Amino acid sequence: MTTRSVSSSSYRRMFGGPGTASRPSSSRSYVTTSTRTYSLGSALRPSTSRSLYASSPGGVYATRSSAVRLRSSVPGVRLLQDSVDFSLADAINTEFKNTRTNEKVELQELNDRFANYIDKVRFLEQQNKILLAELEQLKGQGKSRLGDLYEEEMRELRRQVDQLTNDKARVEVERDNLTEDIMRLREKLQEEMLQREEAENTLQSFRQDVDNASLARLDLERKVESLQEEIAFLKKLHEEEIQELQAQIQEQHVQIDVDVSKPDLTAALRDVRQQYESVAAKNLQEAEEWYKSKFADLSEAANRNNDALRQAKQESNEYRRQVQSLTCEVDALKGTNESLERQMREMEENFAVEAANYQDTIGRLQDEIQNMKEEMARHLREYQDLLNVKMALDIEIATYRKLLEGEESRISLPLPNFSSLNLRETNLDSLPLVDTHSKRTLLIKTVETRDGQVINETSQHHDDLE
């Protein structure tokens, strides 16, 4: 906190002597040189808690350690010797000139550094103005324009997502309706297939009946043929009997003609012939009636079987046409279902791709917004850092100004002429000691900031002696 400067006596350092050497260690020399140390601090770094040190009059950046100054008005200065060589004054003047030359060089360096700091401050102020303009532009125009643009694009994306959601719901409803239609058609197809199986079974039974009827018809035809053969045989037999009877009648007639005396035989033959003719006619009539009745029955049965067969064929053809039409309808519905399912899959894939693209766009826009926010925060931090650097540079400039003012005031003081001093002998033991301590006031200022805003500021004063 304090910087001490060790003062050495120029007189003892240059001349020495037994008088001075025999003095106790508590004695002090009164011809001294003053040294001054300048400490230049760098720019303060921004932090959550900063401590700014300032001292009076020069501040923490200029620590001054002062030794006893040689004043021309110091009373009671006496030396042990009556006469002193004035070359001592020349040596002191030479050393003082060297010190002044060194101080001038140091001041020149300080001025150069001060000019560099001023240029740096001006450059930082220009950068600060540029950043402030960019920040205002980002806050004013960029925020509203980008915000409106992002909001409009987000609204458009939400509208498209809602439209796609509605389209998806509509397609799902159509898919459900088509699924119900397909299920209904499948049930109808099952019913038609059952009816087809029943028709085929009925047709098979009808075919069996037709086969049975055909067999019966063949049997009846064989019976009719056998009956016709029997009738023909009976007719032939009847004709032969008639011929035999006629031959017998002729023979009897001849005999009757020959034997006129027998009239009763002719009447008997006539009676026998009539009886045979009546029996033959009766048998022929009965045979014809039985044949006609059997033929009518067989014809009627054949007609019935033909009607049933024709009806069965018609029903079979009708069922076949229905099965073909239903098969074509099922195939068409299958094709429609496949096309709708393919369209639904394509729409789902397109919707998934578009949704992924929209999600990517939303993510990219959110990343851009986050990057813009981070960039704005970075600009704000840089601006705050520049403000902190500017404050530190302002403090250093004020410190340098005070140092320069102190140096100018010190340079403007009149310098004593050592050649005109009247050195007289005096008792060093009786001389009062000159106070070699300098008082320094230390100001400790603590500033706490958060997000670029000052939240707490405290100041403490300390007095130190050197």
UniProtKB/Swiss-Prot annotation:
Modified residues (Phosphotyrosine): Y53, Y61, Y117
Modification Phosphoserine occurs at: 5, 7-10, 25-26, 34, 39, 42, 47, 49, 51, 55-56, 66, 72-73, 83, 87, 144, 214, 226, 299, 325, 409, 412, 419-420, 430, 438, 459
Location of the region described as Head in the Swiss-Prot/TrEMBL record: 1-95
Start and end residues of each IF rod domain: 103-411
Sites of the Glycyl lysine isopeptide (Lys-Gly) (interchain with G-Cter in SUMO2) crosslink: K104, K120, K129, K139, K223, K262, K294, K313, K373, K439, K445
PTM: One of the most prominent phosphoproteins in various cells of mesenchymal origin. Phosphorylation is enhanced during cell division, at which time vimentin filaments are significantly reorganized. Phosphorylation by PKN1 inhibits the formation of filaments. Filament disassembly during mitosis is promoted by phosphorylation at Ser-55 as well as by nestin. Phosphorylated at Ser-56 by CDK5 during neutrophil secretion in the cytoplasm. Phosphorylated by STK33. Phosphorylated on tyrosine residues by SRMS. S-nitrosylation is induced by interferon-gamma and oxidatively-modified low-densitity lipoprotein (LDL(ox)) possibly implicating the iNOS-S100A8/9 transnitrosylase complex.
Assembly mode: Homomer assembled from elementary dimers. Identified in complexes that contain VIM, EZR, AHNAK, BFSP1, BFSP2, ANK2, PLEC, PRX and spectrin. Interacts with BCAS3. Interacts with LGSN. Interacts with SYNM. Interacts (via rod region) with PLEC (via CH 1 domain). Interacts with STK33. Interacts with LARP6. Interacts with RAB8B. Interacts with TOR1A; the interaction associates TOR1A with the cytoskeleton. Interacts with TOR1AIP1. Interacts with TOR1AIP1. Interacts with DIAPH1. Interacts with EPPK1; interaction is dependent of higher-order structure of intermediate filament.
Protein name as it appears in the record: Vimentin
Annotated gene: VIM
